[in-house]
Design a protein with these regions (language model features):
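Predominantly soluble domains enriched in secretory-pathway, periplasmic, or organellar proteins
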Residues: 1-278
Length: 278
């Protein structure tokens, strides 16, 4: 994981534009030997990238508004928690929600004030991927994370303007049959929140689970993969389909109806398909 840098490329030509060194001191003031960029996401509202620095426990804000497209500096370093991994946004795009998975926390960063808004204690080793948000019938807008180290989904309030009483607090904990989850996904057109259990050690690695948005409870778990492990759900643009990988040297991508969860088609002969991005 060396060197500790990020590089900005031209989006059309892939020509390197600038290389920037990372800060090498963590949130406790300790000088680091390595500092990994764990995730990069683009703000929905401002010309910035939000960058998670794993070992440092810092969320950095990178400004890409230079009209000459030559300078892409870090303009804010926000102390958060170690060790940061993957994350995404709330429904407004104003808050960045990232897992500090070795600390068993979700971190909430306010991108408008560029400050730490909250930390949320979760289960063991939260791993939301880009995460998921939806409107719960009781709690309003929520986000959620699944976990590698524990078989549960932690759902937390994510509407500080509309529901400040439960903002950034756990409101539901939904038990899964196994630990080992890597991704949790949904779409406004689907009634489900879907969770994989890819790293399950109890025989559930071929299954995905469907949580009902209407009831806030686990509805069913069912096998999708045949040769390997089910991993990473991705919806198509209109939310009518969800694509799931069968992670195996003789793998496949399985397309499900996003409402009935019935299989529509299966693309086979794919060696270890993993992420799919729309």
């Amino acid at each position: 994981y060396w060197p500790p840098q990020y590089v900005v490329y031209d989006g059309l030509t892939l020509e390197p534009k600038q290389r920037v060194d990372l800060p090498m001191v963590d949130i406790d003031g300790v000088t680091l030997i390595e500092n990994r960029v764990a995730s990069i996401v683009a703000s929905h509202n401002d010309p910035v990238w939000v960058v998670s620095l794993k070992e440092a426990g810092i969320v950095s804000i990178v400004d890409y508004s230079d009209p000459g497209r030559l300078n892409f500096p870090i303009v804010s370093n926000i102390p958060a928690a170690k060790f940061l991994h993957d994350g995404g946004f709330d429904h407004t795009g104003n808050y960045f929600l990232v897992a500090a998975n070795a600390s068993n926390k979700m971190v909430v960063v306010d991108l408008q004030t560029r400050s730490l808004a909250a930390t949320i204690d979760t289960g063991a080793v939260p791993h939301p991927g880009r995460g998921v948000n939806w409107q719960d019938p009781v709690y309003g807008w929520v986000n959620a994370t699944s976990h590698i180290g524990e078989g549960k989904v932690s759902v937390y309030g994510a509407d500080p303007a509309g529901r400040p009483d439960i903002a950034w607090q756990i409101v539901r904990e939904i038990t899964l049959p196994s630990a080992g989850s890597l991704f949790i996904k949904s779409h406004p057109a689907s009634p489900w929140v879907l969770v994989d259990m890819t790293l399950s050690a109890t025989g559930d690695e071929k299954d995905i689970c469907a949580i009902s948005k209407e009831t806030g409870t686990l509805d069913r778990c069912f096998p999708v993969a045949t040769n390997g492990r089910a991993v990473h759900m991705e919806f198509n643009m209109d939310g009518s389909e969800v694509w799931v990988s069968d992670w195996d040297p003789s793998g496949a991508v399985i397309v499900l109806d996003s409402t009935t969860l019935a299989e529509i088609r299966r693309f086979t002969g794919l060696p270890t398909p993993t992420g799919k991005f729309n």
